[in-house]
Amino acid sequence: MDAELAALIWLTIEGGIPLVVAGGAGEERLVVRDALLALVPVGASVMRLAGDREDFAWMPQAGELGWRSTAPSRPMQPGKPGAVMVAALEDREGGTWGEAAHLAIRALTAGYSLIATASGATLQDVLGHLSRPPVSAIDDELARLGVVLLLGDGPRVSVAHYLRPAARDPGGHVQRPAPAALATWSAKTSRYDHFAWGLVAELAGRIGGRPIAFEREQARRASVIAGATRA
């Protein structure tokens, strides 16, 4: 990704917006996901989900969110809302799948964040895999997945999508805005086309900031990244 997109991703991860890496090969997704963990703020609580052995004993809200644990209770340091879950939401060895994947997605409504991988070459594929059994996440839950990066060749991010959670308008009506593209890679020009400018107010509001401050900070970080790349 270029400096502008990298700065945007940095800001969203730091602000607690979830992120999913899809597309590409399975190992490529894991490499990109783990590299992005370096952008999690220092001191943040990071909880790596244990695949098919995950029992969410660390999550106080698990029962309220519908988790039915069959494991004996055991003392653990509880995770805090705002903790970043790290997972592979995939039906693969070491992956978190089925009811556990659904619980991880549902936990986003309780203030947790997520950096994960998922299978699927397109956004529709990703959402389709997670909406069908055995995960069975509903649309309003999937809309909280935040940023979805689709890998192409390289692995390069070919498209960065933003999933927008349902919200109420001033009249109290529930609005479910469609996903939006943050950036797309153009093979013709060998550069990214950026569209996040149309979502600045929404992104800034989601992380608790002002649009002008968000734009300035993104530009500052992009400059830092570009300078480091040239060095």
Language-model region placement:
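P-loop NTP-binding catalytic core
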Residues: 1-18, 38
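General structural feature for long, well-ordered alpha-helical segments within catalytic domains
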Residues: 5, 28-32, 100
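ATP-binding Walker
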Residues: 15, 26-27
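Conserved P-loop NTPase
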Residues: 146-228
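Switch/coupling sub-region of P-loop NTPases
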Residues: 17-23, 33, 37-153
